[in-house]
Amino acid sequence: MKKFIAILFIVIFPVISMAHMGHYNKYNKIEMEIFRNGELIGYNYYFFERNGEETIITNQFKFSVDLLGTTIFQVESYGEEKYIKDQLISFNSKTLQNDKEKFVNLELNKKTRKYDIKGSSFNGEATTNNVIGNWWNHKILQAGSQISPISGSIKEQVVTFIGKEKIDL
């Protein structure tokens, strides 16, 4: 169970300030299904909206884990990332996790060039090297730390490349 939660955390909860938005120009949405033991337990959707140099990515996800007929973990979230060119300028989310309300309100401070974060687990500043933990952006794999899109907390990470695989859809 711990391994499942850890993998789910890495998959669901891991956007660097320079997001290479051009890599995502052809996408209007990304839809992911979440499975556990071969059973569909939820979804994770990203919607891309563009207006000139501004891009807004909306994220919605919901899943629950049941064990012996009892729900042991449940989460539902809505988030919005806003970019001007490749620069993340804001991120806001609201989450209900096991009946507890969580949130993140992040803004780029133009004077300090750092993120001002007000979250349910963290209030303070973060450098723009941090990544919002959402999986549409491949930069999550290169970042040394991430900002939780659920609570705003900052988590150090080490990602080790172990191989390359082509997946045909």
Task: Show where each model-derived region lies.
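Hydrophobic residues embedded in beta-strands of well-ordered beta-sheets
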Residues: E53-I56, L88-I89, T112-D116
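N-terminal cleavable signal peptides for secretion/export
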Residues: S17-Y78, F91-K100, G152-L169
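Short, low-complexity Ser/Thr-rich regulatory SLiMs
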Residues: F47-G52, Y83-K85, L108
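Solvent-exposed helix/loop surface patches that form functional interfaces
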Residues: N25-Y27, N92-L169
